[in-house]
Amino acid sequence: RGLGDVYKRQDTNGVYADVMEKALYNGIISGISLDGTKFFYVNPLAVKPKAVKKDQRLIHVEPRRQKWFACACCPPNLARMMTSLGEYIYTTEGNTVYQNLFIGSDMKTEVNGKEITLHVTTSYPWEETVSVRVESMEDAAFEYAFRVPGWCRGMTVTVSYTHLRAHET
């Protein structure tokens, strides 16, 4: 079981998944360059190059991402995190599939002895629309629980062109 399972067991209202999302977008993926060749080895959250040079407390902070070096621990940890991302995106318990993070992905699982596949399409966090398509060879009754982010103030759910009210837990 992944960290997402631990968090979901503690609280199903999405608070822990909000923290996972913030860490993912603001700490983890921001630490690597788009081409995957340079890294921030510390995450100062904000870098002002002139201030870094003048302030002795920031001597360990590099104002630009650095290339790989001999004793690198961050790049392998980033790779490990990204390859285990599925454990954070989805969790299951009983007949409920939880979607903790909104990331374009496919998830195949078994619920009540029936195989289902969720196809999630999104450009989140840059766009707020998330599309979920459920695929199953046979009728499969299950609950699909998705997180309403703590910052979200106006959400709509549409199933087969019908607007629905979501249940909050």
Identify the role of each PLM range.
Residues P44-H119, Y124-P125:
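Catalytic cores of secreted or luminal carbohydrate-active enzymes
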Residues T91-R165:
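Beta-rich accessory regions
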Residues D5-D35:
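Catalytic-core region of carbohydrate-active enzymes that cleave or remodel glycosidic bonds
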Residues R1-K8, P75-S84, E128-V130:
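Well-ordered alpha-helical segments within folded domains of soluble proteins
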Residues E21, Y25-I29, F40, R80-T83, ...:
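Generic alpha-helical structural context detector
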Residues R1, S33-F40:
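Short, solvent-exposed turn/loop segments enriched in Gly/Ser/Thr/Pro and often Arg
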Residues A23, T37-K50:
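Short, surface-exposed recognition loops and adjoining beta-strand edges that mediate ligand/DNA contacts
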Residues G2-Q10, T162-T169:
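Conserved small/polar residues in nucleotide/adenosyl-binding loops
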